[in-house]
Amino acid sequence: QRQMCIRDSNPSYEELENSYLDMVVAGTEKAVLMVESEAKELNEDLMLGAVLFGHQEMQAVIKACTELKQKAGKEDWVLNTDEETPVYSAELTEKYSEQITNAFTIKDKTERTAAIGVIKDDIVSSYPDADEIQLGKVLGAFKNLEKDIVRKNILSNQPRIDGRDTDTVRPIFIETDVLPSAHGSSLFTRGETQAIVVATLGSSRDAQRIESIEGQSTDNFMLHYNFPAYSVGEIGMPLGPKRREIGHGNLAKRAIKAVLPDVEDFGYTMRVVSEITESNGSSSMASVCGTSLSLMDAGVPLSSPVAGIAMGLIKEGDEFAVLTDILGDEDHLGDMDFKVAGTETGITALQMDIKISGINESIMETALVKAKAARDHILGIMNKTISKPKELSENAPAMKSFMVDKDKIKEIIGKGGAVIKSMQEQTGATVDINDDGMVSVFGQNQSSMQECLAIIEGILEEPELNKVYKGTVVKIVEFGAFVNILPGKDGLLHISEISNERTENVNDVLEEGQVLEVKLIGFDRGKMKLSMKALIENAE
């Protein structure tokens, strides 16, 4: 059970860090216009209550703005009445209503767009003497007619553009592990919207460094959303991400953040890329579903799967219809884009944009209830494909963290970093050590990590008297040879301990780089004394 409180002022940065909800609400005196939020699996009643509370609290600011307008504001502009557009609207309605109505019964987006294009070309050709301004008014009347026809059909309980009723989610197709070499991947298709989502795991060093007005920080979870022109049948230069792509990526990221494991439990840096290959409504929510699937496919221990759905609204006067899983045309011709993402337990992200003067509590409540039903439906399909995180992929990097005594840190690092650099070059692994003695080993694969761990274990191991070690000759001197038996630990094999027989010249018996077995027979002022002769005597 969660205990919560509501503050009547803006929260501090510290409070937001520990808050279950971060929400921005914009509106007028009478209605809500925009909501942007992220949450930690809150139920629909709490989210609705937060929106209404935000609307209530903004009234003081609205009142102050109204008072300022009365004191210092200017008169409102009076727009000139456009007398031509209504005439064009009447002409187009009489001649093209039936054709447009039939076009909007075509379920396939490409075919429907082509049919609408033919009608549009016919309209343009029927006004050969129209100048640019007049033609603009004609096309404006055409768009209004499109909008009126689609909206009236929906409000009169007729099938939507693709034949669905207001509550049905489009057919969903899901695959995971579609890119076997990737750490995690998924293909999420809902109707004519499709996303290929790939998850990549990296070390803590791969975390994104952020400098903001709040200070410096790092982010171990990155989500990049790409919307290429071909996904909507267009062409264009693949330049850097635009505002829309950044916004959609941030929304999907906020939806997933609530279910990510703590850094202490899962030290990987996670990067997800959602590539939209086809789009006809709510590719951002497809990215949410695909991200959840790909992270679980990569073995990331999410606390719960996350799904997202986009809701729409058609409103005329007091009549309204809330649409589940809107198409691109329904988004364009409708009054609201209401995106809800979350788990079976609750909502993790909510975004709402309104094109009309605002919506009331009843509409928001209806939208949230319908979104919950749709989200549960999608989660049910997702869980049939993958219901819990897999084991880490063989292609994924391997990582292990453990604590060591603080006085051992310098031994692992070595003088001038020599030991840790050599270790990383030899194994290809990355080693991070913090001041508390937390050591994190990150290998390109299991064997790389295990090789590095073995070296560290050797460094931490204390030489044991009378134990036999396999060592490497690192240096030959006149009186013997120095043999490395543990990482960073060399002992002296005296010339008298090489053999039972007298050895005149060490170079006649040993050479640098030679691997041999030696026994630790004692310590001389902290220095290790090694023997090969002791092994021969034991064998005899």
Q: Predicted segment positions?
A:
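Short, small-residue-biased leader/transition segments that mark boundaries at the very start
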Residues: 2-6
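Flexible glycine/proline-rich, aromatic-decorated loop/lid segments
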Residues: 9-32, 218-222, 264, 308-353
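Structured alpha-helical segments in the cores of large, soluble enzyme domains
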Residues: 21-26, 219-225, 229, 248-263, ...
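Glycine-rich, flexible beta-strand/loop modules in the N-terminal catalytic cores of phosphate-handling
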Residues: 29, 36, 178, 183-268, ...
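Long, charged amphipathic helices and adjacent flexible linkers at domain junctions
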Residues: 72-75, 79-86, 377-403, 450-470
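Extended amphipathic alpha-helical scaffolds
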Residues: 77-215, 397-411, 419, 426-427
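Long, amphipathic alpha-helical stalk/connector segments used for oligomerization, subunit docking
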Residues: 350-370, 374, 378-385
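Single-stranded RNA-binding regions, centering on S1/OB-family and related RNA-binding modules
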Residues: 395-399, 406-540
